Amino acid sequence: MEDQVILVDEHDNKVGFAGKMAAHQRGALHRAISIFVFDSHSRLMLQRRAAGKYHSGGLWSNTCCSHPRPNEESADAARRRLREEMGVDCELKKAFSFVYRTKFGSGLIEHEFDHVFFGNHDGRPVLNPDEADDWKWVDLTELTVDVRKRPETYSFWLAACLDRVISCRSLNGAGAAAQKIGSTITLMA
C-alpha cells in the first residue's frame, strides 16, 4: 500500500489524507518535516538523496526530510525518520515552519507545510541506501555561497529555507538547538 500524507490547509489544520504520489501529482498542500543536525563546530550534516528517489534524487539536501504518517505528530515523525534515514538519534527542537510550492521537471509538484527541527550530534551517520547515498559536514557560510553558485546541486527546500535556518541559529546561539519561533514563511517557485 502506498504511503499516505496528511493534507492540510494554509494554517496546517488537517483536512484529510492522500497517497504520497497522488498528492505530489496534484500539488496538494501536505505536512512535511525537515531536520537540520549540527555538530559541536556548528557544521550542518548534509545528505545526498539517493539517485532512485521519486524526485530530487542525487541532490544535496538537509540532514533528513520526510512526511509524518497519518495521525503521527510532526516531532515524532522527525525523530523516527532521522533514525530510519540516517541512523542518528538526538534530541530535536522545533525551529520554524514554512510553506513552499515548486514544480519538478518530472511534472511532480511539491507543495508542503514544512516543520523544521534542529538537533545536535557529533557522530557519523549510518545511511539507509534507499534514502541517501552520501553525507558530509558543511560550514553554513560555505554552504550559502555554494547554494548561490550551484543551486542545481541542492534540493529546492534547502535553498528556500537556508537563510531562515542561519537566522534561527544566530538568534538562539550556535551551540544550542533553536527554540520554537512560531512563525511561518511562504515561498513559491
UniProtKB/Swiss-Prot annotation:
Reaction(s) the record says it catalyses? isopentenyl diphosphate = dimethylallyl diphosphate
Name the protein family. Answer: Belongs to the IPP isomerase type 1 family.
Question: A GO BP term, please?
Answer: dimethylallyl diphosphate biosynthetic process
Q: State the EC number(s).
A: 5.3.3.2
The top EC class is isomerase
Q: Where does Mg(2+) bind?
A: 65, 85
Q: What cofactors are annotated for this protein?
A: Mg(2+); Mn(2+)
- Cofactor binding note of this UniProt entry: Binds 1 Mg(2+) ion per subunit. The magnesium ion binds only when substrate is bound.
What is this organism's lineage? Bacteria, Pseudomonadati, Pseudomonadota, Betaproteobacteria, Rhodocyclales
Can you name the source organism? Aromatoleum aromaticum (strain DSM 19018 / LMG 30748 / EbN1) (Azoarcus sp. (strain EbN1))
Q: Which cysteines are joined by disulfide bonds?
A: none
Q: Which GO terms describe its cellular component?
A: cytoplasm
Q: In which pathway does it act?
A: Isoprenoid biosynthesis; dimethylallyl diphosphate biosynthesis; dimethylallyl diphosphate from isopentenyl diphosphate: step 1/1
Name of the protein: Isopentenyl-diphosphate Delta-isomerase 2
